[in-house]
Amino acid sequence: MGARASVLSGGKLDAWEKIRLRPGGKKKYRLKHIVWASRELKRFALNPGLLETTEGCKKIIGQLQPSLQTGSEELKSLFNTIVVLYYVHQKIEVRDTKEALDKLQEEQDKHQQKTQQATADKGVSKGVSQNYPILQNLQGQMVHQSLSPRTLNAWVKVIEEKAFSPEVIPMFSALSEGATPQDLNTMLNTVGGHQAAMQMLKDTINEEAAEWDRLHPVHAGPIPPGQMREPRGSDIAGTTSTLQEQIAWMTSNPPVPVGEIYKRWIILGLNKIVRMYSPVSILDIKQGPKEPFRDYVDRFFKTLRAEQATQEVKGWMTETLLVQNANPDCKTILKALGPGATLEEMMTACQGVGGPSHKARILAEAMSKATGAAIMMQKSNFKGQRRIVKCFNCGKEGHIARNCRAPRKRGCWKCGQEGHQMKDCTERQANFLGKMWPSNKGRPGNFLQNRPEPTAPPAESFGFGEEIAPSPKQEQKDKEQVPPLISLKSLFGSDQ
């Protein structure tokens, strides 16, 4: 124990015993931890004498660190102890185990960055090309690395899922970064379907190749020794050139980027195909009455990507058509924002338009307006139709019998006879069965008594002693006109 305890002495031992096992904990490192570490090193077949120096601790750390992921808790504790002891030997102050581990990680990261930088500087000094897929090996030879099956699979999957929608073009551009004409032809040949579109693409490539030949005529005379021939349009398309020639053109000084030129031709043809597969014009993109504004904006910009126009024209379309083709609800909101509103402000302002909450709010406003108009109409109608009441007792208007000041009439208010009230009166008005109202008692009670009744006495009261006898024809006519009491003739006329 004494031999192992002599690893630290003097000021190093005092610094060791001030370091805590855990951040904020009470327990600190002691000599027993060094003794335990030396025994564990023997168990792992390592030399315990390495604990006495900084370089020895560094070697132990290098041996134990790769095994931390699969090691036991004892191995991790041993590693932590060695790291703390490593910084005590360097006289670097640490407060606890975690701080020592953080310092070690930071030190290793800096060392790794320096190593990578040195490797990169060495590669640049030797002129090694890092331009994928054309790489320069250590012998200085240009080597082509073909496209991986994963890249080709991603391209085929995009074509199968998206057909030739506008997002296919940036996907093709990303997957074909730095590719040679041979790589580009490999990508095009992997497309199984859509042969009509591929034929359109071939026609576009042939047109661009012919234009290249017209603008870059072949120089007369033989080619000087050691100089490459100039690429023709068919060479750029990869039909009359080999892979070695393509690499030589792309890496010569000055280089001829045949891969980038061919890529531009393909993208030009893809733009034509996208326009054919997206026949909808930007002028036809209009927001539906119930369509959320966000979905409308998505459709608008998806169609705008397929439009073959300059950025200035697309900006004008966005500022003008996006507001003009919105539905009335959103258009009102967008016009209130003004012409300088950003897309974020538009989408925030129109958020919820067309949704359930917006519909409920509009419906509530419409119902409140309709209800208010109906109430005002009813109030105005009631003002013009004031009910006129009539007293049953005195027959005057303006009050009812309960408030009448005239002497109370005796008997029934309906027939005038005493002995019963109006509710028990047997004299009924004409019903739907045709029961007639006595002609000598005026009009029935359900008619207004506005017709003046004759006040002259009957003819027999003059005392002439003569009776006015009706003629036989008049009597027969009266019998025919008066229907029986239980007849429906009074209701339906001569149909019965």
Curated annotation (Swiss-Prot):
It comes from the Viruses. Keywords: AIDS, Capsid protein, Host cell membrane, Host cytoplasm, Host endosome, Host membrane, Host nucleus, Host-virus interaction, Lipoprotein, Membrane, Metal-binding, Methylation, Myristate, Phosphoprotein, Repeat, RNA-binding, Viral budding, Viral budding via the host ESCRT complexes, Viral nucleoprotein, Viral release from host cell, Virion, Zinc, Zinc-finger. Residues 103-124, 436-496 are annotated as: Disordered. InterPro entries: Gag_p24_C, Gag_p6, Lentvrl_matrix_N, Matrix_HIV/RSV_N, Primate_lentivir_Gag_pol-like, Retrov_capsid_C, Retrov_capsid_N, Retrovr_matrix. A motif (Nuclear localization signal) lies at residues 26-32. SUPFAM superfamilies: Retroviral matrix proteins, Retrovirus capsid dimerization domain-like, Retrovirus capsid protein, N-terminal core domain, Retrovirus zinc finger-like domains. The modification Phosphoserine is found at residue 148. SMART domains: ZnF_C2HC. Residues 277-363 are annotated as: Dimerization/Multimerization of capsid protein p24. A zinc finger (CCHC-type) spans 389-406, 410-427. Residues 12-19 are annotated as: Interaction with host AP3D1. Residues 189-227 are annotated as: Interaction with host PPIA/CYPA and NUP153. Late-budding domains (L domains) are short sequence motifs essential for viral particle budding. They recruit proteins of the host ESCRT machinery (Endosomal Sorting Complex Required for Transport) or ESCRT-associated proteins. p6-gag contains two L domains: a PTAP/PSAP motif, which interacts with the UEV domain of TSG101 and a LYPX(n)L motif which interacts with PDCD6IP/AIP1. This is Gag polyprotein. It comes from Human immunodeficiency virus type 1 group M subtype F2 (isolate MP257). The lineage of its organism: Viruses, Riboviria, Pararnavirae, Artverviricota, Revtraviricetes. The gene is gag.
